[in-house]
Every structure is written in C-alpha cells, then in structure tokens.
Amino acid sequence: MNDFSLELPVRTNKPRETGQSILIDNGYPLQFFKDAIAGASDYIDFVKFGWGTSLLTKDLEEKISTLKEHDITFFFGGTLFEKYVSQKKVNEFHRYCTYFGCEYIEISNGTLPMTNKEKAAYIADFSDEFLVLSEVGSKDAELASRQSSEEWLEYIVEDMEAGAEKVITEARESGTGGICSSSGDVRFQIVDDIISSDIDINRLIFEAPNKTLQQGFIQKIGPNVNLANIPFHDAIALETLRLGLRSDTFFL
C-alpha cells in the first residue's frame, strides 16, 4: 500500500488467518488472470476455481504456477467435489486434487442431496491429507430460506469438529442463496446468532460476491472478516472497503 500517513483500520498481513480475501476464477483468459493477480497480489489470499471450471481450463497449471509465484493459495469449487460424489468417484476426485498439488480442498453439499453428517464424514476422511474448507448452506434459495439459525449453528460446529479448517457460508456467485435471501439481502439474524455463539468467527468465511454484501459483513464484523467469491475486478476495491477508503465504509 502507498502510505501517506492516513489513520486507517489495522489490517492483517499475508500470510494471514483473518481478513482473508478469496477471489473466484470463472474461467478468465490467462493473460487477464496473470495481470489481475500481479496487480493486486498483496490483497489476495486464495483463488477458487469456480464450480467445475478447472476441468475446462486449458492453462490451469500455468494459472496455478502464477498463484504460487505470488504466495496465493488455490482450491477447486465444492460443486466439483459434489459432481464426483454423485458419480461415486470420490477416489478420482482425490487423485485430481493430488495431481494438481492442492493444499486446500472445498467440501460442500449445496447442490447434491447429502446430509450434513454425510458431508462431515467426507471432511473427516479428506482432512487427513488436505486442509478442508467446508461449505454450509443450500444454493437453492427456497431451501435455504427454510434453514433456521439452529441448523446453521449445528452444521458449522459439526463441520469444524469433523476437521474443517474453516467453514464457508454459502451465498453463491450471485448472492441469492444460502445465507442470503432470494432478493440478495443477508439474513443478518443468522449472522448475529453465529456471532453470539461460541463459534470462532475467524474460522468462518462469508461469501460476498458484490459490494453490498462486502460492505454489510465489514460493517457487521469488522475490516478483518474473511470474505469469498470476490470477483477479480474487485480485489483492490474490496481492500478500500476494508480500510474505509470508500464512501460506503468511510466511517469505520
């Protein structure tokens, strides 16, 4: 950051456990990917190769190499895991992640009918070899709207006890599922119940694919909240929100 002596919120430095920003790659061209990473690497902690895009990305290994050059971790979207599970090919998913040198994997049940206990069993199995990011919440807005705070808390705790390093709260890349309503509003009662529980908020990652959601979580939890599904073009814009350098969070 270019420092000209402004008093700003204190941000954690890389490698960081809190205040993480996780970008989502939806299949960007290689040169755009490289330029975006090089220009904002100080503010990017992870890149997720969204849903099953990694299977179609011809320059995947070069993208991964670019991330490693900038000390940025990567993982594949949880929907890819679910696709392998749906075809009873979990061992092939393991081989896929091993082949590409994954340190982290995402395990979810946002699309596939799978109980949280079943998901937790996969977390326990994979956590022996990988750092697991689990995901809680349905991608279906109608199903998600019926999930109570009690269920959210139960599933988060169950995933953590099974071995999840961190738990991601679903919001989709559209911000219209999981912890968000179909209209895109955060269900802040659930967030409040999580905050007031014994769950370590630093072990949670909130999907926030747009400025409204990013602003809401920063104002509710603070500048060092973990945020995911950030579009590539928002990496620096998000950091300005965290630092109160944008009108929306000016008075942090």
From Swiss-Prot:
It catalyses: (2R)-O-phospho-3-sulfolactate = phosphoenolpyruvate + sulfite + H(+). Keywords: Lyase. Gene3D superfamilies: Aldolase class I. Pfam families: ComA. GO terms for molecular function: phosphosulfolactate synthase activity. The keyword Nucleotide-binding does not apply. The keyword Coiled coil does not apply. InterPro entries: Aldolase_TIM, ComA_synth, ComA_synth_sf. Its EC number is 4.4.1.19. It comes from the Bacteria. Catalyzes the addition of sulfite to phosphoenolpyruvate (PEP) to yield (2R)-phospho-3-sulfolactate (PSL). Is probably involved in the biosynthesis of L-sulfolactate, which is a major constituent of sporulating cells and mature spores. Belongs to the phosphosulfolactate synthase family. This is Phosphosulfolactate synthase. The gene is yitD.
